[in-house]
């Protein structure tokens, strides 16, 4: 009889622990949703570590919905722009434009009214949270979310791992993976603005006139015109 009591207590503890963990995950997902959905626009500098281990410093400006601009410090002449339809890659030195479908895990920063879930079969969500890990680093609670965002066809894309911390809740960076499972890591260095009341919409444009003049840079870096 004593043995069965012990087994019952152990099973009860496992069930309670599992229920508590499930509730923690739901709370963490809700916290992330609420934070991301408060973002209207945001700019920051970042450090990028590419699959080839090359480090670069960049600047990103986002505005919802679907607008993004990225520039890099130094000799890297790449400018990345996005709108509701296209992701535009512009090589300034050669004046070459490449347009791609604006479908990628970066949409976690640019979509409105994000909703995440745990069920891969629920097509009403923007993404599926496949894993959540909490770590205490220097007395600060860090939460890592592994999320599979959906593309425009509702298909799940390669994961983005979002690194956040609490008090106050903020995004510290993320890791994205290509089709070969190679990782590109982004670390936010400094937030420059958050929900600015007035934003120059020309930031997200690249006019032919500016291209001809070579006047294409909008970021904080001292780039040659």
Residue ranges of predicted features:
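Solvent-exposed strand-loop boundary residues in beta-sheet-rich modules
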Residues: 50-52, 93-95, 180
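An acidic-aromatic
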Residues: 60-111
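A short, Trp-centered hydrophobic/proline-enriched beta-strand micro-motif
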Residues: 34-54
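Sec-dependent N-terminal signal peptides
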Residues: 5-15
């Amino acid at each position: 009889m004593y043995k069965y009591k012990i087994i019952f207590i152990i099973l009860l503890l496992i069930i309670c622990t599992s229920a508590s963990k499930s509730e923690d995950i739901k709370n963490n997902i809700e916290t992330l949703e609420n934070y991301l959905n408060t973002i209207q626009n945001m700019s920051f500098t970042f450090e990028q570590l590419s699959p080839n281990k090359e480090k670069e410093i960049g600047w990103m400006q986002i505005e919802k919905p679907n607008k993004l601009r990225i520039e890099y410090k130094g000799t890297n002449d790449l400018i990345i722009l996005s709108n509701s339809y296209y992701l535009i890659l512009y090589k300034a030195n050669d004046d070459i434009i490449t347009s791609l479908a604006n479908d990628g895990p970066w949409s976690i920063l640019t979509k409105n009214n994000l909703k995440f879930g745990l069920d891969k079969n629920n097509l009403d969500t923007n993404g599926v949270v496949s894993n959540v890990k909490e770590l205490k680093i220097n007395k600060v609670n860090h939460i890592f979310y592994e999320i599979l965002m959906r593309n425009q066809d509702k298909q799940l894309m390669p994961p983005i791992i979002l690194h956040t911390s609490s008090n106050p809740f903020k995004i510290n960076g993320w890791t994205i993976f290509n089709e070969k499972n190679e990782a590109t890591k982004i670390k936010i260095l400094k937030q420059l603005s958050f929900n600015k009341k007035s934003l120059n919409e020309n930031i997200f444009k690249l006019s032919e006139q500016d291209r001809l003049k070579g006047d294409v840079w909008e970021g904080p870096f001292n780039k040659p015109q």
